[in-house]
Amino acid sequence: MESNNNEKPYVIGLDMGGTNSIFGIVDQRGTIKAQTAIKTGAYPDINDYVAAAVEALQPALDLVGGIGQIRGMGIGAPNGNFYTGNIEDAANLVWRGIVPIAQLFEDALGVPARVTNDA
């Protein structure tokens, strides 16, 4: 039986910048349990970026017992739209136009993802 999402003790946080993307796995008190980073601009294709992020996250996920321990993901991104889950025309990112970042991470990780503006 799959556990209730409210019982999962950790969340993934992503601070996305034009140069670096820093990921942290935190508990309910905000204590960082694991972290990793990738170069944001090294991936001109958003799908390659998400794949690299998931790969970089794997050792951190292993430290906390795997993706089954993750409640969701929060993403702070330039021009992030909380209502749509998209990054919209961010000048300091390599991807242009509308980028459905929350949906891409939901699909890749299988957990809910939300985005907010961190310009």
What are these regions (language model features)?
Residues 26, 37-38, 93:
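Residue-level structural signal for beta-strand termini and adjacent loop
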Residues 50-54, 69-72, 79-119:
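Glycine-rich phosphate-binding loop and adjoining helix at the ATP-binding site
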Residues 13, 74-76:
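Short, well-ordered beta-strand segments
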Residues 2-33:
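Gly/Thr-rich phosphate-binding beta-strand-loop-beta motif of the actin/hexokinase/Hsp70
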Residues 7-8, 67-70:
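A general structural motif
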Residues 23, 38, 75:
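Residue-level signal for inorganic ion chemistry
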Residues 32-68, 100-103:
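N-terminal phosphate-binding loop and adjacent alpha-helix
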